[in-house]
Each structure stands twice: as C-alpha cells, then as structure tokens.
C-alpha cells in the first residue's frame, strides 16, 4: 500500500494471521489494524472468527479516523479447520472498495470439492495464496498465488516482479517440479478421489 496523505498505509487483519504477515509489515513498512476475537469465541486467537458485521464496524471505525485500509487479510481455513464466511466478507469489501486477501494455506483442496465453490477466489476474494504442500502432493514450500477478477493488480508481469523481490534467483527446481507434477495430478481425476476420501472420513 502506498502512503496516504503522508500517513503509513494500514492493513486490516484478523489476529490469527501467520507471522509471515508481520515480516511483510516490517519489510514494507505498513501498519496492521487487528481484528480481535470476541471473548466468548471458542478457540479464541487460533480461530478468530470475523463476521460481516464485525468487518463492517471495523471499516466504519477506520473511516471515522480518516483511514482506509489498502486490504483486508483473513486466514481461512484457520489452524483448527474453521472456515470464514468468505462470500459475506467479500461483499463487505466490495461495498467499501477494499480488496479481500485470503491466506488459504490450509485449503488448497477447496477448489476441487463438488462445484468448486468453496475456494476463496470463487467466493469473491481479490487475491489468495494456497500452500500446496499442506494439503496437496507438493514438496514443502510449494505454493500458489491466485488473482481474482477484482484483484488490485491484473498485470501478471507486475505480480511476478513483486514476487521476485522476496524470492531467490536460485529457486528450488525440486519444489517447482513438484508443483508441475501436482498440477498434472489435479487434472487427472483428483476431484473424484477427494470426494471418495471425504466419504471415507465421514465413516470413521
């Protein structure tokens, strides 16, 4: 986010965000306004549920301070498997003209459930990162970055240049090859196998 009227840019984020977000804030010099879980929320900090009403209130509060976040950062699924109502949050973000950024590290498989409608991009997120190595057959460290139709940046070259700032000029080709191999697996009947796996789990 670029400075706004000489002020540091602000990101609105659920408090259960991965520490990598803190590293990004330190490197890129932006502030984080936290969305904290309510005291009665089960799981509290690890789950940190954010409702559409809560997000609306937080955005209105920032607006009263003359602040407009450059993005909303939500972790879904969380570390306990809980899933946020991404569709409702995306609608709020559209109303306020702020992009929804989703850490979908633990939900790379969601695209391949019946109808594919559970993935954050399908639900309206502007940008989303999937850690393929967590729930797909990918070597540790392999991940995907997805851009929605409403992403603030649509220029693929610009996105690649931004990623290059944080990447190595000597990447692991084992990881890259595993991502390519995973793509092949995903295109060869993976949704059916995932559905069968879900069926097995329901019988446990």
Regions found by a protein language model. Name each.
Residues 1-204:
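Conserved PLP-enzyme active-site core in the AAT-like
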């Amino acid at each position: 986010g670029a400075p706004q009227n000489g002020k540091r840019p602000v990101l609105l984020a659920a408090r259960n965000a991965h520490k990598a977000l803190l590293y990004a804030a330190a490197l890129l010099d932006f502030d984080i306004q936290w969305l904290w879980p309510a005291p009665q929320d089960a799981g509290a900090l690890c789950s940190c549920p954010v409702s559409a009403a809560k997000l609306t209130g937080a955005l209105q509060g920032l607006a009263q301070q003359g602040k407009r976040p450059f993005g909303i950062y939500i972790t879904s699924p969380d570390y306990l498997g809980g899933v946020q109502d991404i569709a409702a949050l995306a609608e709020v973000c559209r109303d306020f003209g702020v992009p929804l950024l989703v850490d979908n590290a633990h939900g790379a498989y969601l695209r391949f459930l019946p109808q594919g409608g559970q993935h954050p991009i399908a639900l309206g997120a502007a940008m989303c990162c999937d850690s393929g190595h967590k729930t797909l057959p990918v070597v540790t460290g392999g991940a995907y970055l997805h851009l929605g139709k409403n992403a603030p940046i649509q220029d693929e070259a610009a996105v690649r240049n931004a990623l290059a700032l944080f990447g190595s000029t000597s990447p692991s080709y084992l990881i890259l090859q595993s991502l390519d191999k995973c793509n092949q697996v995903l295109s060869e009947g993976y949704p059916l196998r995932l559905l069968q796996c879900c069926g097995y789990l329901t019988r446990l």
